C-alpha cells in the first residue's frame, strides 16, 4: 500500500484517545471468529462512556459491542474509508451532509428502516441525499438560543422580549442603566456560525433556502459550492443589523465562555447566546433564568439545534445478514428514548427529532414550548468550511472591517477556494496491524503504537489512558 499522506491523521497516532471495550468473554475463539461476532462502534466523545455505552451493552448481552473513541471529524472517517478501516457504526457531532458526501457509497442506506421513518420529515430532509437515500440519523438535540436573566429584567422593569423589536429595545434599555444587554463568546467559531444562521432561520428553511442547502450538500456535485444570491445576501444584512442593535464590538471577539458566565453571574449581562443547559445551571445558583428563541424578521420564532451526534452504518454489513441484523439492533438501542436520556446532562430536557420519543419539557424550557411543538428546531449547517469561514467573516463584521456586502463576498469566495493538500508523511510502516481486540493477543495496533512512542521518547515504560489509539496501523 502506498504511503499515507494526510496531516489530520496525526490524531490517530499521537493524540491520546481513550478507548473502552465492553466485550463478553470470548474464551479461546479464533481472531477471525471474534471479528465476525463483534460490532465496532466509534463514539465521538469519551463522555459517552459514562452512561450511554454501558447502557447499550446492558441491553444487548448477546452481542459483542466494541466501543472505541473515534474522532469528531468526518475527514478522519474518510481516511479510514480510503484505507479499508471504516468501523461498523460511526458517530460524529460536527457534521454536515456536505462533508459526509464522500462517504455516501460506503454507508448503508437507512431510508426504508423504522429508525428513519420515526424521524420527523422536516428534520430528516437535512440528512436526505439527492437520490432519496439516507445514510445518517440524528440523536437528540442540544438547543441553543438566548439565556436570559429574568431578575435583571424585573429589577429594571424591562419587558421580556417577545419579538426582534422588543429584543433590541431591551438591549437599549439595559445600556441606559449600565448593564450589557447582550453578548456571547465570539472567540469561538460555533458562536459566530450559529449567530449568522440563527438570525435568518426562516429564510434558510424556506423553499429557496432548502434548494441552496440541497445543492451545497449534493454528493454528486464534484465542484465546490458557494452561497446563493437570494437567501445569503440578506442573511449578512441581518447580521450587520444585529451587530449594530446589540453594540457588538472588537472587545466581544475576546470573550470566551467563562468570561460570559462571569458577567452573567455578576449581574453585568442580561442575555447571552448559549445552550439551554445554562438555564438549569443558573437556576441552581439562585438566578431566575429563562430561555428564549431566535426572533425572526417575519415574526417566527426558532431554536438553533445541533444533534448531540449523528449515526451511520457501514455498507459492508449488508454482505452478512447476521451481522447486519446485529448492527440494526445496536442502532435501534442507540436511538431509543432510554439511551438518549443518557446522552444529555442531568436536568436537561430531552429534545428529540423522533416521533418515537415522548416530549417531556421541564420548567427550564417553558418559554419555548410552543416553538418546540411547532417543530421549529433548525438543524445548523455545520460543515468544516462553515465553522472556519464563519469565524473569519463574522469576526471581521463585528470588528467593523466588513460590511454586509463585503462579508457576503468574502464568505462566498472562501467556500469556493480549493483546499491545499498536505504532503506530510506521518507514518511509514512495513507491516499492518489490526486495532481489534482479541482474547489471545490483545490489540496489535495499540501495542505497536505504544512501543513506537516509547521508542521516540526513549522510555522503558509508557503510561497511557486505557486504549490510546483509534485506528489500524497500515502497511506503507
Residue spans of the language-model regions?
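Solvent-exposed loop/linker segments at secondary-structure transitions
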Residues: 423-476
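A structural signal for short loop-to-beta-strand junctions that line the ligand-binding cleft
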Residues: 87-88, 116-151, 180-181, 296-304, ...
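Glycine-centered hinge/linker elements that transmit conformational signals in sensory
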Residues: 215-253
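C-terminal capping/gating helix-and-loop segments adjacent to ligand/active sites or protein-protein/ligand interfaces
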Residues: 47-49, 66-67, 129, 305, ...
Amino acid at each position: 500500500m502506498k504511503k499515507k499522506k494526510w496531516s489530520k491523521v496525526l490524531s490517530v497516532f499521537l493524540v491520546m484517545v481513550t478507548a473502552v471495550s465492553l466485550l463478553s468473554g470470548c474464551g479461546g475463539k479464533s481472531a477471525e471468529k471474534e471479528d465476525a461476532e463483534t460490532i465496532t462502534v466509534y463514539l465521538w466523545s469519551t463522555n459517552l462512556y459514562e452512561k450511554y455505552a454501558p447502557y447499550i451493552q446492558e441491553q444487548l448481552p448477546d452481542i459483542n459491542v466494541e466501543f472505541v473513541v473515534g474522532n469528531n471529524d468526518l475527514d478522519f472517517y474518510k481516511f479510514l474509508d480510503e484505507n479499508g478501516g471504516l468501523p461498523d457504526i460511526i458517530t460524529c457531532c460536527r457534521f454536515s451532509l456536505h462533508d459526509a458526501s464522500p462517504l455516501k457509497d460506503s454507508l448503508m442506506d437507512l431510508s426504508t428502516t423504522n429508525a428513519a421513518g420515526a424521524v420527523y420529515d422536516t428534520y430528516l430532509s437535512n440528512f436526505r441525499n439527492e437520490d432519496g437515500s439516507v445514510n445518517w440519523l440524528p440523536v437528540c438535540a442540544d438547543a441553543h438560543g438566548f439565556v436570559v436573566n429574568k431578575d435583571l429584567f424585573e429589577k429594571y422593569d424591562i419587558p421580556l422580549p417577545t419579538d426582534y423589536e422588543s429584543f433590541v429595545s431591551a438591549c437599549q434599555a439595559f445600556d441606559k442603566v449600565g448593564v450589557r444587554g447582550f453578548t456571547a463568546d465570539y472567540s469561538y467559531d460555533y458562536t459566530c456560525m450559529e449567530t449568522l444562521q440563527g438570525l435568518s432561520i426562516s429564510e434558510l428553511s424556506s423553499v429557496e433556502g432548502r434548494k441552496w442547502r440541497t445543492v451545497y450538500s449534493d454528493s454528486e456535485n464534484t465542484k465546490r459550492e458557494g452561497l446563493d444570491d437570494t437567501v445569503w445576501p440578506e442573511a449578512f444584512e441581518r447580521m450587520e443589523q444585529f451587530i449594530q442593535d446589540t453594540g457588538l464590538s472588537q472587545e466581544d471577539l475576546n470573550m470566551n465562555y467563562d468570561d460570559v458566565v462571569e458577567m452573567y453571574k455578576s449581574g453585568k449581562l442580561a442575555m447571552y447566546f448559549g445552550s439551554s443547559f445554562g438555564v438549569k445551571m443558573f437556576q441552581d445558583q439562585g438566578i431566575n433564568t429563562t430561555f428564549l428563541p431566535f426572533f425572526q424578521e417575519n415574526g417566527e420564532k426558532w431554536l438553533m439545534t445541533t444533534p448531540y451526534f449523528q449515526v451511520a452504518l457501514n455498507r459492508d454489513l449488508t454482505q452478512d445478514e447476521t451481522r447486519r441484523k446485529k448492527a440494526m439492533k445496536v442502532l435501534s438501542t442507540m436511538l431509543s428514548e432510554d439511551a438518549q436520556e443518557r446522552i444529555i446532562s442531568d436536568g436537561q430536557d430531552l429534545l428529540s427529532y423522533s416521533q418515537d420519543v415522548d416530549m417531556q419539557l421541564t420548567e427550564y424550557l417553558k418559554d419555548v414550548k410552543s416553538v418546540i411543538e411547532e417543530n421549529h428546531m433548525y438543524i445548523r449547517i455545520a460543515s468544516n468550511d462553515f465553522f472556519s469561514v464563519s469565524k473569519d467573516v463574522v469576526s471581521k463584521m463585528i470588528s467593523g472591517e466588513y460590511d454586509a456586502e463585503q462579508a457576503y463576498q468574502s464568505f462566498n469566495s472562501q467556500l469556493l477556494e480549493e483546499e491545499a493538500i498536505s504532503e506530510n508523511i506521518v507514518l511509514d510502516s512495513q507491516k499492518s496491524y489490526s486495532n481489534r481486540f482479541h482474547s489471545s493477543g490483545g490489540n496489535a495496533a495499540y501495542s505497536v503504537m505504544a512501543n513506537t512512542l516509547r521508542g521516540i521518547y526513549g522510555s522503558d515504560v509508557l503510561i497511557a489512558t486505557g486504549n490510546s489509539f483509534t485506528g489500524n496501523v497500515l502497511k506503507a
